[in-house]
Amino acid sequence: MIIRLSSAILLLCSITLAAYENEPERYTDKDLQKQIIMDEIMHEINGHKVTVFSKTYCPYSKRLKRILANYDINDLKIIEVNQEPDMKTMQEMLKTITGRSTVPQLFIDGEFIGGHAETRAIEDRGELKPLLLRARAL
């Protein structure tokens, strides 16, 4: 399943942040922190041709990274969620974007591709390389 991340999410983030700035008493510091993390996640997803949210100790994350290592990807960003200061909130925001809080999560050209199982299936069907080529990641 591929989900196109649209500007609607960015618009929602901007509206939320603008509302916070206009009426700060209605929002908590936690709300602002969530918004900041959401903005950082979206910046990484949209700022790189290939983005992976991973955990260093997760076997599925390791497998997905091994799949990607077979390709000479020219713009790959790997974010090790377990090394982030607010891992729990980051996973919560990833769930808002993709419907999943688990890792790994692979994005190509701003599109959510899936986790290890989906990536393996796409590669087995011969569709991963064309996705990477369309994204100009190879």
Regions flagged by a language model, labelled:
Residues 2-49, 138:
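N-terminal leader/targeting and pre-domain segments
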Residues 94-102:
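Thiol/disulfide oxidoreductase modules built on the thioredoxin-like
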Residues 37-79:
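Local sequence-structure signature of Cys/Sec-based thiol-disulfide redox active-site neighborhoods
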Residues 108-138:
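Non-catalytic, surface beta->alpha helical segment in thiol-disulfide oxidoreductase systems
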Residues 58-61, 91, 104, 111, ...:
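Domain-wide signal for the mature, well-folded portions of proteins, strongly enriched
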Residues 41-42, 91-95:
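Short hydrophobic/charged patches on amphipathic alpha-helices used for structural packing
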Residues 80-85:
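Short beta->alpha junction loops
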Residues 37, 57-60, 64, 86-90, ...:
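Alpha-helical interaction elements in eukaryotic regulators
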